[in-house]
């Protein structure tokens, strides 16, 4: 009679099996590596055959954990049993009947990497999913040919925004999340930052939401300024490089009255700032200045991230807005 396996040993064997069958499936192995993989899989099968009751109980426990806490309708049992172990029911316990991916009338669909809510040491944290959203629901499938979804949730109350803290690899700037107060956050990675922005736009537009400054599409100001923008800035520099400095000196002597409403002059004065503290740029595209220096603000395009584009003494660069203050009280 076989003795019982310790729980931690069973868990380790289960994770090892997941690693061999799922994680290594997408890897290119050498001939020797493939042979070793097959040997380990065979040994795992032999162990499971030697302890059938142990692993049968484990499978039943997993199914029970998947359904705990949510009352499922009788016809939902088969659907729940077919879900991946990493997939879960909607936060609010709602049940969405199975629907084939190709039967949906959608606003946007495509392959994304979905971050698993829970993942083991060996199992991949991100899984490729065919994602589809309609006017009110977001579905995700194993592929675009699947007859039923892996999961679904209502978009009611949800918003979408970029999140560059989810990964540290090449897809760091391709990640976004769908979130709502007191609800589960769903996190995804697209194939490119542009595709992620398209998903965010589509989701926000479908909800009739206008993005606030905090939810505007991500544009990393630490990266180099877009080539076309940079060219536009420096093309104007020869004509205007000395002008802001001259105007600044004049304004120091004769500040504009608060009630001045003279169109362009008023606008120009409003764009003059002075340094609150010394600031040394960490990157070539950042402007360095000292306390009291006069800076002319050209653009507030990166306001969301706390940066503006400024010009000082013929040099143009990014300026942290927290380090400057308006020169005149307009």
Curated annotation (Swiss-Prot):
Belongs to the SKAP family. Transmembrane segments: none annotated. It comes from Xenopus laevis. PANTHER family: SRC KINASE-ASSOCIATED PHOSPHOPROTEIN 2, SRC-ASSOCIATED ADAPTOR PROTEIN. One of its GO terms (biological process) is B cell activation. InterPro entries: PH-like_dom_sf, PH_domain, SH3-like_dom_sf, SH3_domain, SKAP_fam. Residues 57-84, 236-261 are annotated as: Disordered. Residues 105-208 form the PH domain. It is found in: Cytoplasm. Phosphorylated on tyrosines. It comes from the Eukaryota. SMART domains: PH, SH3. Signal peptide: none annotated. This is Src kinase-associated phosphoprotein 2-B.
């Amino acid at each position: 009679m076989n003795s019982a396996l310790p729980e931690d040993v069973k868990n380790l064997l289960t994770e090892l099996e997941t690693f061999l069958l799922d994680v290594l499936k997408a890897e290119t192995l050498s001939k020797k590596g493939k042979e070793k993989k097959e040997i380990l899989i065979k040994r795992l099968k032999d162990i499971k055959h030697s302890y059938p009751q142990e692993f049968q109980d484990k499978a039943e426990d997993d199914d029970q954990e998947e359904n705990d806490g949510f009352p499922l309708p009788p016809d939902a049992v088969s659907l729940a049993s077919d879900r991946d172990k990493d997939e879960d029911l909607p936060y609010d316990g709602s049940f969405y009947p199975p629907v084939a991916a190709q039967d949906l009338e959608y606003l946007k669909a495509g392959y994304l990497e979905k971050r698993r809510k829970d993942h083991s040491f060996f199992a991949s944290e991100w899984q490729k999913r065919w994602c589809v959203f309609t006017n009110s629901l977001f579905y995700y499938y194993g592929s675009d040919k699947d007859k039923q979804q892996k999961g679904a949730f209502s978009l009611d109350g949800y918003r979408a925004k970029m999140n560059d803290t989810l990964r540290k690899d090449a897809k760091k700037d391709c990640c976004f999340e769908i979130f709502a107060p007191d609800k589960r956050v769903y996190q995804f990675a697209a194939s490119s930052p542009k595709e992620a922005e398209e998903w965010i736009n589509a989701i926000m537009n479908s909800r009739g939401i206008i993005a606030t400054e905090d939810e505007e599409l991500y544009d990393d100001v630490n990266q180099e300024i877009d080539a076309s923008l940079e060219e536009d800035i420096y093309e104007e520099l020869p004509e205007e490089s000395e002008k802001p400095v001259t105007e600044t000196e004049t304004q120091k002597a004769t500040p504009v009255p608060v009630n001045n409403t003279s169109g362009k002059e008023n606008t120009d004065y409003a764009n003059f700032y002075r340094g609150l503290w010394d600031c040394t740029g960490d990157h070539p595209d950042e402007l360095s200045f000292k306390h009291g220096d006069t800076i002319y603000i050209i653009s507030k395009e990166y306001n969301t991230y706390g940066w503006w584009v400024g010009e000082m003494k013929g040099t143009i660069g990014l300026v942290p807005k927290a380090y400057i203050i308006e020169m005149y009280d307009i």
